Amino acid sequence: MPLMVLLLSQRTGGVAQLLSVHGLDTHRRNNLVLLDEDTAASCIAGQLVLLSLSTGARRYLPGRDGGGVGAVAVHPSRTLLAVGEKARPGPASAGPAVYIYSYPGLEVVKVLRGGTERAYSALAFDGERGDTLASVGHFPDFLLTLWDWRQEAIVLRAKAFSQDVYGVAFSPYFEGQLTTSGQGHIRFWRMASTFTGLKLQGAIGKFGNVELSDVAAFVELPDGKVLSSTETGELLLWDGGLIKVVLTRPGSRPCHDGPIEALLLDRPAGRVLSAGADGRVRMWDFGAVNDAEPREDSHSLELSPLDEVVVAEGAALSALLADSGGRRWVVADKAGNVYTVALPPAGPVGKGAVVTRVASHPAGAVAGLQLSARTHTALVASADGCLRALDYVSGAVLAEAATPQRITAFTPLPAASPACPGGAMTAATGYRDGVVRLHARCAEGLALVGVAKAHKGAVAALAVSADGGRLVSAGEDGSVFFFDLTAQPQPGTGVPGMPACGLLAPRAFIKLPSGSGTVTCGVWEAAEGGGVLLGTNRGTILSVPLPPPDLNTHHSYEWAAGTSAVSSYQLVVPKPKRPKKKKGKNDGEEGDKEGGEQDEGQGGEDKGGEQADGEGGSKEGGEEGRAAEEEEEEEADDEADGGAGGPSSTTGELISLTLAPNEPGALLVTAGGVGHAARKAWRVRMGEPLAAPLLEGFASAPVTCLAHAGPEGRLALLGSGDGLVRLQALEEPFGSAAPGALPLWEAPLHDMQSGRVSGLGLSHDGAYLVTAAADGALHLLALALPPELAPPPTTQPGDEPLPGPAALPLRPPDVLAAAAYTLEEEKQQAERDQQVREAEEKKLSVRQRLGLIRAEFEALLAENEAAPEALRLPRADLEVDPGLRALMEAEALRREEVARLELAWESERQRLGLAKLRRYFLDGLESERVVLHSLRGSSTVTTFRVAKLSDETRAELAAMRQAARAAAAASAAAGGEGGAGGRDTDARGKGSDTGGGPGGDAAARARLAEATAALEEGTASGKLNKADLRRLARKRREAEWAAFNGTRPDDTYDSPADLAAIEEARRTIGDFKLKSDPNYVVPEEERLTPQRKRLAMLELEEALHDIAAAFNAKFFALRDVKRKVLADVRVKLAALAELAAAAGAATGGADPDATAAAYLAPFSGLPSGLLPEEEPAEAREAVTDADLAAFAARKAEDERKAAAAAAGGLGGFAGAAAGPKKPAAGGAAPAGGALAGGAAGSGSVAHGAGGPSAGGQQGLTAAEEALAKMMAAVPQSELEKGLAAYNRRRVEHMRSKLSEEITAMLDAFDDAHSALKAEKLGLEADVKAGQMRLLVGLQELQLLREFDKRESVLLAKRQAKLDDKQEIVDKIAECTDKLETKRLELEGLVARRAAVVAELDAVVPESDPFREALVRVFHRRIKRSKKKAGGGGGEDDYDSEEDEEDEDMGDDEVDDDDDGGEEVCPPGCDQSVYERVCDLREKRLDEEDMIAEFTKTIEVLRKEKEALAKKQRLVEQGLAAVNADMAEFQKEKQGRLNQVEVIVALRMHQIEYLLDGCLPDDLSACLVFSASQLRRLQARVDELEEEKAGLRAAHKELRRQHAALLRDKADKEARVAELEARAHDVQMLKFGQVIDLELLDRVSSSRGTEELREDLKKQELAYARELAEWDAKINARMDELVVLTRENTACLNAVSELTAAQRRLESGLTATRKGLFADPVQQRRAEVEERDALVALVNAQAAELDRLKGQLLALRRKDTSMYA
């Protein structure tokens, strides 16, 4: 077999090569698979071991990710192998991968990445094709991932569980299903198609009343049920996520004595195989397991195994596999043994099976390792309690010693120790139960040479002195026990009865002071007679003195004075100085040089702290950012710890303590934890306050193992807590490494999670390195060390000494019981036993003396009786103690009182217990389960067991109903107000925007009335000319058109009738949308909330309660009827018995009893009353004589059994007389006795009271009997015969009548009983359905509560948007109202201005020669002074600004501009007329000013309305977005609710989903729909057809009307065209052109309007451009001003700084030159000049600032000075 060389380091070359890995990790579940018929595979540490079942040879497949191998799975074709690995933590790690290897070539085919974060724990291929691979991750994510491994793609993933998962398997029978199991759970998965796609849905198995258990193995049965294992040895059969039945062996014994670790289904053979911790493989019948049903009174079923195979007695089996043919099994146990079981071709399997142990390997975590100094042999202590002698080159197990307890401590003994027989390899081991054992390797294996139980708890540490003469053991209970190691067995305690401890001689123990912590390691001091040094989990070193040799341990081993003599030393390490790194491109290299490098085996993590900066990031940038972060962290750490280089104490555990061979009094210490102390190995001198660093440790885990080898200890061997092993060359013996020296060799050999290195060592010849760790693996590596580091040749060549039996001491008795006494307890118990024996001996001597005295007294009594009567003494005189009898009587009375009190106490206790049980089981019930039997037949009906609705439930229901009513009322009120407001708003909006609607119609009608009135007034007065009359007529026509158009609805107008019809159609359309539709949006009124769902659940619970209560009321009424019926039947049966007696008397010789039995025979089975189960509440409190008799019988039986047991087993002969007695004949009849018998008895009694009967002849006298015989001999007459016949017919008639009445009563009751039972069946189905609805509702309520917070946020957002919208709508309505008011007022002002014009026409008629001049004066624009608001008198109260509102004046009202000349009355014109025109002009101008103001106000309101409308659109957009978010949220919520499974009970006739006339296998595509709704939909189809036909007819009629209206419209348009043509012809004939009448009116009334308007527009544009230019200039000047201000400020600051600097310089200069060559006058003058210059500069800048401010003010003013 070629060696598999592991490339461990590229820097050091081939220093170490892996040769083999010993051990099997059989403690890991599902860690053994079959690759072919001869090869099994198992994971251990970082290797996949391939084991040959025929030869036992091993091959290795190394892991690739460096963290170990986690799981393995075999493809169904057995040509592929999947290996899931573990990744080492760190920034450079990409996570673990699953590698697909070809087999047997072992070449990588595929690589699957991204399935988990740290490690894989289980793998499995699916089905027969193996297209899908399932993987389960380890802590912390526990991800279940399904892979399409051929495409290297993830299909699905979900979290498997929150704890360890042991196994995963696909269903071999149902595609898309798989099962996982692990710690405390089993989970059933299926790939389900949801509305969001394919998902993994897992149902956790519910254990219910069964004890929770880890599920190590499971197997799926063909019908989908799953059989799983338990820790207690039972088998669980699962069906649909629930336990169907628990399988046990007969006698309620578990299927295995211990946990079941493996299950296998052998379908061809029809059996299920199970392997457990009892070393047996049991076979179970597949049919019995598959069809198992629980018993009625239990959830379990007892099954007997078909057969069993004993693999190994006492072996804990952990794996069970079968080859492809099923004729051979492969079994592994937790001790590392692998077996093959060959099955016989026929016959019983248990007898014919051949079990062969194929291989034996170390298994379990390694607690310690000892290499031989002579041979390639090692002692390996496994944590599972097995100590093995191993040939680590060949891997053969030479010997082993197993114990049931775990090994917790290990230390080898030096060969010079007296306890090493013949110098053999000897080791001391400590166990979890506190036992310390010594094992020596001998010719027969591993011999036990010493044993002692020193502690109550586990042994935490062991240490042997350098000379091998003393051993110390530290326990977790805080005790430290000292032993002397001897060459011969010692008696030990000297106390009789105590066993010897072999070569362990107990010396003494001490208790550590409280608060010392738990001991983790120890070493003896080098000084002669020195004590022991113990490391603790609190980072302290305890110095424990050696007990004195003359210590008295006769009564106790405890040395009390030693506790106070214990001293403590706290490990304090110096905090490292962290120099700040230079930000350069070689930072990483410098860090590497400072901190040391690690090779590729460590994942590229250098001590310098290099990290990947992410994809696409530059190395320099990442290093710079990291350097800054590290500097901040270092500064914070330095501040917390008192500065860099200061002391830093460790609170982590101390892992190892070793004496420094090159320095007496110094210790080599390694510490745990995550701090700085855990990253190094330290040299500690107990007299110094700080520890000195010795060796660099590991960055990822503390140093857990430290050893030295080579010449003078110049080679250090280090192991870490995560499986790293390092060889480090030392600069000096047992010293530190050279500065900057790299490790000689380093590699991650062991598992990163469980591979804590526990042992390292070089072979005696230096050729091999052996490592051991907690992952159970032992690595053997070949070394090629440099000559200077190679160990010297061995000084003890030869074979290992193996002493024979004669050279070994006697084997001491082993301590195997976990509850055995410790040495101290055994000593104390031995002394107590000795004291008890001495007390018993004293008691025996006293009893013997009493016996002699009693015999002497009896002899005196006999002598007294033999004496003559005269000499005989009375018996009272011979009474030894006269007061003894009185004392005994007083004692009897006292005991009687005590018994009475005890009985009273017991009675009260029973009463309180009964009250507690009644309160717990009955007080919460409104009605318990009561059975009611029918009177005929065996039919029964029961009540509903109804619990009372709690007060909390009722209060919550009432509160929620009240809240629902209040919410409904508030919603109705808000809806009414909102609807009214909405309608008003719409009306206002339409009236204002389109002119339609009531508002616009009213305004148009008002204008029409005004125009009509003006026209009529003008016509009647005759003051208006023809042009004005025509103008008014046209205005009237315009008003008429406006009024007509106002009645026309706009495009947005909706008819109320149409809206009502649409609403009715929406309400009755019958559109049933599936809630499973991805696009389904739940309507507002149907959306579920937690409050609604909780209210529905409470109402359903109340309804179920009311249904059950109503039925129970009917039930109890029927029970009362039964009681009455039985009473009536009892009376009628008594009458029937009397008739039977009369019939017997009538027939003469008939037997009365036979006649009565014949009469009552049809009713013999009737009960005499209600049965106890029909009145449980009444029967519960009643105690009958039969109950007392039965209790007495049981008590007597118990006493008899107790007496029989006390008598020594008299068997059945002693108990025959004490058996239970039968009730007497006159005892109480059973409750279910026949009512007819009682009726017969009562009938006979009644008859006896009324007259003679056949039975009454026994009481006749002799004369009466003679008379009766004589009468009987006389033949009857015809009358008597007739009378007798009449009596017989009468009796038969009454009998038949009574029988019919009784039968009718019974039938009526039975019919009512049957009806009630049928009703109960229906109600029970409804109640169960309601309860299932409650369960579904509970799941929905949980989901709704999860969604409630998000929904509340969305609702709050939507309500805020609605409030904003309502506020804006209200503001728009307010603006609309204001606009309408202003418009009406403006129309009034326009009318007033028209009245002024009309008044002008009246003052200056058309015939006036000065009209044109006066009209020009009237329309002239002049500058007017407007009075300021709130102004008083004076010139300052007037504003001389030009009227800015001229542009708003009509063009027909302006004739000429003010030319600036003086205005005078036209020559020849009347001055009064001229002044009147001027007054009218002032009126016009006043009206125009008011019109301008109103126009400006209307424009402002219009702009405000437009801004509000824009804001309303934005709010509506936001509201639409919130509604969209709400709809998406509701979809998501409905989707989650759709995933809740709802159970619907259907009958077969309700299923109409058939394929080819058959019910399909898969009903997942079915839709459950209400039959009533389906019928309503069908009826709705007919209704819609009828509505469609009606709508077609209406549409046809409307089209006909539309055509008629179009024809009318065409006629009207033709008429209008004809009139327009006539008007055109008339105008052309009369004027030669078409006259614009409106233009003519405007021209006639105001000339030059258009020219003025054009000029005005030009001026406005010019002014606007000029204002824009000035605004730009102002902004530029403002920017310049800001820049200058900043520059000025900077200059001032500079001047201030220069001035201060100058003053400082001058002060210094003055101080230095000390007055030499200094002219104070010149200096003062220079200072004044410089200060003046600065002041001038500041003044100039201030003037510039003032100038700029003036410009700004000038630019901001609106007067005309800026244009000058």
Curated annotation (Swiss-Prot):
SMART domains tied to this protein: WD40 (SM00320)
**Which parts form a coiled-coil structure per UniProt?**
821-850, 1479-1517, 1567-1674, 1729-1758
Kindly indicate whether the keyword DNA-binding belongs to this entry.
no
Biased segments, Basic and acidic residues type: 585-596, 604-628
According to its UniProt record, where is this protein located? Cell projection, Cilium, Flagellum; Cytoplasm, Cytoskeleton, Flagellum axoneme
Q: Where is the composition biased (Acidic residues)?
A: 629-641, 1434-1462
Extract the InterPro entries matched here. Beta-prop_EML_1st (IPR055439), WD40/YVTN_repeat-like_dom_sf (IPR015943), WD40_repeat_dom_sf (IPR036322), WD40_rpt (IPR001680)
Protein biosynthesis is among the record's keywords: no
Which parts are the WD repeats?
A: 115-157, 160-199, 208-248, 255-294, 361-400, 454-493, 495-534, 649-692, 707-752, 753-791
The entry's cellular-component GO terms read: axoneme; motile cilium; nuclear speck
Give the matching Pfam families: Beta-prop_EML, WD40
Kindly give the PROSITE patterns that the UniProt entry links to this protein: WD_REPEATS_1 (PS00678), WD_REPEATS_2 (PS50082), WD_REPEATS_REGION (PS50294)
Q: Keywords for this entry?
A: Cell projection, Cilium, Coiled coil, Cytoplasm, Cytoskeleton, Flagellum, Repeat, WD repeat
Basic residues compositional bias, start-end: 575-584
The entry's family comment says: Belongs to the CFAP44 family.
Role summary = Flagellar protein involved in sperm flagellum axoneme organization and function.
Q: Supply the name of the protein.
A: Cilia- and flagella-associated protein 44
Q: Give the organism, scientific name.
A: Chlamydomonas reinhardtii
Gene for this chain: CFAP44
